[in-house]
Amino acid sequence: MAEEQTALSLSWVFGASAHVKHGVVNLSDGYTDKICYLAANTAVIYDKRLRRQLFLQGHTSPITCIVTTEDRSHVVTADTGPEALLVVWNVRTGLPTRTVQQPHRHGVSTMDMSADGQWLATVSAADPESGEQEVSLWSMAALLTPPEAAPPGQGPLRPLVTTLVPAGDVQHSIRFSPNNPAELISNGRRRVYFWSWAPGSPRFQYYSPPLRSRDFKQSVGDFVSSVFVPGTTQALTATTDGDLVVWDEQGIAAQVGTSATDRRAIKLMRIHNCPITLLATVGDFIVSGGEDGYVRFFDPLLRIVAWFEDLAAGPVTSVAFSAVLPDRLAHADAADTLNRFMVPDFVVATRNSRIVSVQSASFEEYDADRRRGSSVLDSLLADVVDLAAHPTRAEFAVLGRDGGLQRWDSIAHCLLGGRAFERQVGACLTYSRDGSLLVVGFGSGHLHILNADDCSDLYVMRNTAAGLVRVAVSNTGKHIAAADENHQLLLYAYLPYKHTMRWEYVGRCRSHHGPIASVVFGESPSGQTRLLSVGGDGRVVEYDLAASSVAAGVQVASFYDFPPGGGAPTSLSFAPPLAYFQAFAADTHLLVSGADGTVASWDINTAPLERSATAAEGAGGEARWAAVLGDPDLLREMRDYFVYAQIKTQGEDALEPRDVPGTVPVDLVPDLMRSAGFYPSESDIDNLLHHVQYMAHSRNMESLEVVTLADLLCLYINHRPLFNVTHADIVAAFRELGGRGDPGSCVPKLSREQLLSLLQSTGEPMSGEELTAALAALTGAHTPEKSMPVSVAAEQFSADVLGFDTTEAGAEAAT
C-alpha cells in the first residue's frame, strides 16, 4: 500500500558509509542474524539469512553515528546539519520510536550508550565559527518512550546533563566506562577528557591530563579513539603511530597535588606497526583494528590473546559483536572453555566498503582461508565518481576515482565482474544504446572503449592532455563525444578503414569558456543524429556532425547563450519521446550515486504522479501553481491585482456592465510582476515574453496576447529571483564597482558623481529623466545631487536611498 502512495521507494542500497567509525552494529541475538550499517542518509538493517534490507529513513543529512541497545531491540542514529535529528528506531518494525529535533545546534558528531543501557552520551558537532562543542547525557528510558505515552504537558525532550567542551581540540570520540556509567572518556586529536557526573547535577565534572612527548622520550601520534579497560581503573587512547597511551590513577598524582582519581599517562605501548583505526571493548577484552586490516584482542593486562590477520579486507572502521555467544561455546563444559578464546561472533567493516562476518572460533583454525571470514555483502567501490545503467539488461556499472570499474546485477544485487585500471583516475563512463560498448574516460585524458560483457579493451585513445569529465555515445553507436577539463569537446567516429571499421579521432572544438557540464546526443524528427553541449558559461552549442570530418575537424552548427543571472546550467537532456536515459533501466528503477560511497536503487511508481496530475487538472492550473507558491497572502494579493488589471483594461470609469474575461493583456505582465515584489530588468522582461510565446507554441497557437491567472503564477514562480537583494549584495556591488573605504574601514564608498555616472552608463543604463524620477520617488529630493552626499557609502545607499533596514542586516550577520 505504501508503494502505491509513493512515486519513489527505496528498493536496495549498494555500498556503505565506509568512512564512519563504528558505523556498523550487530543485531544478531541468537534468533535472528542481522546487522545495521550506515549508508549516507539511511540506516540499513540487513538480514544475512534472508538477504533482505530494511531501511530506516528520515535523516536529511548523512548519518554520523549509530548505537544499539543491549537487547538489540532498538538502534539510535544521529546526524549533523541544519535539520539535525537524533532518532530511536524499533528494529523489528523499522519505525521511529522517538525523534529529537536539533539535539544539538549543529547535530551530533559521535555518541555512545552505557553498558547498562540506561544512558546515552552525545558530543555535538563543532560550531563552524567558534569551534565550540558540548557533551550531553540523555535518559534512554525517556528516549524509548513514544511521544503518545509521555506524561501530558511534557515539553520537547532535552538532555539531563550538558557541559561545554573547553575550546582548543575538537572531540571526535566518546565512550562510557563499562565499570561505572557515571564515568566517560572523550578525545580529539591531541587532548583527552575524563568526564564524570552525579545524579541531579546539570553539569559534568571533567579533567584533561597533560601529555608531553618528552615524558616518554618519543613523539606521540594523533589520538584516534579511547576506551576504559574493563575491570580496572585504567583507560587507553589509540594513536596514529600504532601506540596505546595508558592512563591510570596511580603514579605521581599525589606528588603534583592532583586528585587520586585524576588519571595520568603512565605508559606508551605499541600494539600495531601502523596507525590504529579503531579501539573498542567486548567483555573483558580490548579490541583494536589497524590500517593494515588486522583485528587484535588483548586482555586487561594488555597481553595479546587472539589476532585475526588474514581478513584482507582493508583498514578497519568497525568491529560489531553479536549479543550472545555462539551455541558451540554457550553450551560447552567448563573444562572445554578453560583457556579458550571466547567472544561472540562479530562483523568487521572496512574503509574499502567491505563488511566481513567472522566466527570467533576461526582463530583456532590452521588454514588461513578459514580465518578470512565470509563477505556479508559484495563491496561497492568506496569512491564512486560515475555510474551508468545498462540500456537493455538489469545491470549497471560504476567507476571509482582510483580507476576501479565494477558491473552489478541490480536484481540479484551481486557483483558480476570488474576491472582495475592501474595508475588511472576514473572520471566518467556510459553505455552505448545497444549495451554492447562501455566507454570510460579518465583523468589522464585516456578514453577506453570496452566490451560491455567482460570489460576488455576494444580501443584505447588519448587525444588530450587534460582530464576527461563527460562522455556520451550516439544513438546509432557511430559517434562518441567527450569533454575535457580545458572546456573542449572531442569527437570520435566509427569509420571504414581497409575493408573494416575502426574508431577514428575526428577533432576537438573549444566552444565554451567555462566547464562543460553535459554532453548529449539526440535525434531530430527526421532521424538525423544531433550533438549538443552545455557549459557553466551558460552556453548551449550544437555541432554539425554531417560537416565534421577527420579533415575538417569538429564544426559548430549554432549556439545559444542563456541570459546572465539565472544560475549556471548543470545538465542537458532531450525530452521524451526518447526511450532510454542514462540513469534509468526500463523505466522501473532509478539509480542514484553521490560522494558518500553508496548507490541507491529506487523503484519508480508513476501512479501517484498520475493521480496528482489528474487532481490538479480537475482543480485547474491555478490550484496547481498556488500549491507551488505556498504563500496564501501573496496569492491573495496577486489575485486582487489581477482582477484590478482586468478592470483597468476596460476603463475604471466605464458605466456599462463589467465583462471580466479572466485574462489580462501580455503587456501588463511586467507591471503585475512588480506589484508582487519582483522588479524585472529589461532582460528579465524579454525572458518573460519569450516564455509567454513558448506557452503559445505548446498550445498550438501562433502567439499569446492574453494570460490567465494560472499563466501569471507560472511566470512568477519560474522567473522570480531565488533570493531577494540584501544589504550584503549592495556592499559587494560597491566593491565590484571599485569602491574604496576609509582607512581602517571595510565599508566601500563611491563618489556621488561616479555612482550617478555608473547608473546612467553601465548594465541597463537609465536616462537622466528616469534617474531623477526614481531618486525623487525614493528620497523626495528634486535633483539627483540632493539625494545623496558627495561621498556615498554602501550602507548609506542601502538605508537612505533604497530603504533597507541595515540594523537588522547587521544583527543577522552578527548571529
Curated annotation (Swiss-Prot):
Does the keyword section mention Cytoplasm? yes
Name the source's superkingdom. Eukaryota
**Keyword Repeat annotated:** yes
* Gene Ontology biological process terms, A to Z: cilium movement
- Compartmental location: Cytoplasm, Cytoskeleton, Flagellum axoneme
Keywords, alphabetical: Cell projection, Cilium, Cytoplasm, Cytoskeleton, Flagellum, Repeat, WD repeat
A cellular-component GO term for this protein: motile cilium
- Xref: InterPro entries: WD40/YVTN_repeat-like_dom_sf (IPR015943), WD40_repeat_dom_sf (IPR036322), WD40_rpt (IPR001680), WD_repeat_EMAP (IPR050630)
What are the WD repeat spans here?
58-99, 103-148, 166-205, 218-257, 271-308, 379-418, 420-460, 463-502, 511-553, 573-612
Listed SUPFAM superfamilies:
WD40 repeat-like
Please explain the role this protein plays, according to its UniProt record. Answer: As component of a spoke-associated complex, regulates flagellar dynein activity by mediating regulatory signals between the radial spokes and dynein arms.
Quote the subunit structure annotation. Answer: Identified in a spoke-associated complex containing CFAP61, CFAP91 and CFAP251; the complex is associated with the radial spokes in the axoneme. The complex associates with Calmodulin; the association is calcium sensitive.
Q: This chain belongs to which protein, by name?
A: Cilia- and flagella-associated protein 251
**Could you tell me which species this protein originates from?**
Chlamydomonas reinhardtii
Q: Which gene encodes it?
A: CFAP251
